[in-house]
A protein has these predicted regions:
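Short, solvent-exposed hinge/capping segments at secondary-structure junctions
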Residues: 125-133, 150-167, 207
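Short conserved beta-strand and strand-loop elements enriched in small hydrophobics
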Residues: 160-180
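The feature marks short, hydrophobic/small-residue-biased sequence motifs that occur predominantly
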Residues: 82-86, 90-91, 95-149, 175, ...
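Mechanotransmission and gating elements of multispan inner-membrane complexes involved in transport
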Residues: 154, 173-241
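Membrane-interface junction motifs in transport/secretion proteins
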Residues: 34, 45-82
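N-terminal Sec/SRP start-transfer signal
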Residues: 1-39, 49-50, 55
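Solvent-exposed, non-transmembrane alpha-helical starts
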Residues: 74-79, 110, 114-117, 128-132, ...
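Envelope-exposed proteins and targeting segments
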Residues: 60-62, 93, 114-119, 144-146, ...
Length: 241
């Protein structure tokens, strides 16, 4: 009881001070609420940035990844020689390596004909370069000329691709080159591009005729079971240019 009496007076005094000027109280409360909103907005922006930056890398099926040392980001890579990736096979802990090609290109909406930029991924269909079942199940089909897979998590401005495929209206243009969309997969957009397309390395070269199979953007490296990623990474850094 004594404790309650001791606590009652300071609480009552504090409350009186708060409500003495109700206008200032409301302004202070609004200020605190606005600050909280800003904090949560910043957290949301941070999470969105992280999710968009990692949407593609986490879907690649590899233990280590090789890029040019001057590349600023995965979506802005600098090409390097495919032979440099092949040199990684000289390390006994490296089980296999696969090249990956990337390029930004305009995609024509099948219905509106409006073009919007997306990211095109080219890979060897004989390899399992992605941790995406929908892509791995279509590897044989991607060996056919002018075939691509479309990311259904792309922005809606690209059109209702799933419905158009079902209606056999699956032909469009990427970088003014005619291609057939033969299926869908799920990856996610990034700040670099509003959508994604995956195709074979040969079809990639048809879309980007100035590119060469000898110059790659990302090297996917798979290690033997039980190998230390940290140790192999250090060894490859010394071996490769």
């Amino acid at each position: 009881m004594n404790y309650t009496n001791w606590l009652y007076f300071p609480m009552r005094l504090a409350w009186r001070q708060l409500i003495f000027d109700r206008t200032k109280l409301m302004v202070a409360i609004c200020g605190v609420l606005f600050a909280c909103v800003l904090v949560f907005m910043q957290l949301g922006f941070r999470d969105a940035l992280y999710a968009s930056a990692t949407s593609a890398p986490v879907k690649l099926d590899g233990d280590l990844f090789l890029m040019h040392k001057q590349s600023e980001a995965m979506w802005r890579p600098i090409e390097f020689k495919r032979s440099e990736l092949m040199r990684a096979l000289g390390n006994p802990a490296v089980a296999d390596v696969f090249p990956l090609y990337l390029g930004l290109a305009p995609f024509k909406n099948i219905e509106t004909k409006v073009k919007r930029t997306l990211m095109v991924y080219g890979f060897d269909p004989d390899s399992t370069s992605f941790r995406i079942e929908a892509i791995n199940n279509k590897r044989e089909a991607l060996k056919l000329k002018d075939t691509v897979l479309f990311d259904e998590y792309s922005r809606p401005e690209f059109g209702p691709i799933g419905q158009l495929i079902a209606a056999n209206q699956n032909w469009t243009e990427i970088k003014d080159y005619k291609v057939a969309i033969i299926g869908l997969f799920r990856m996610g957009v990034s700040f670099a591009a509003d959508g994604n397309v995956v195709t074979s390395d040969i079809n990639f070269m048809r879309i980007f005729p100035k590119r060469s199979l000898d110059n790659i953007d990302v090297g996917i490296i798979k290690l033997t079971p039980g190998s230390s990623q940290t140790s192999v990474k250090g060894e490859l850094e010394k071996l490769l240019d």
